[in-house]
Swiss-Prot record:
GO terms for cellular component: chromosome; cytosol. GO terms for molecular function: DNA binding; structural constituent of chromatin. Gene3D superfamilies: IHF-like DNA-binding proteins. Belongs to the bacterial histone-like protein family. This is Integration host factor subunit beta. The keyword Transcription regulation applies. Disulfide bonds: none annotated. The keyword DNA-binding applies. It comes from Mannheimia haemolytica. Pfam families: Bac_DNA_binding.
Amino acid sequence: MTKSELIESLASKNPSLPIKMVEHCVKELLEQLTATLEEGERIEVRGFGSFSLHYRQPRLGRNPKTGESVLLGAKYVPHFKAGKDLKERVDLL
């Protein structure tokens, strides 16, 4: 599901809300999640899951085009861990 599809789905389930308001809310939610992670904070949505940052050590990579070794620096990457309720609902599929 893309962001546009999410907005359309939410708008169709809430016909009293203008689609522009739904779009604004979705964009604000994503912006808030991003800003919180940028500050290094963890986000927990009970029953759904948690977002956090994981540290990746510097490592030696390889340029696939030339085969040349390249040093990749350390970095933080976003990580999502599904909550118990989400895992149980998805497991029913």
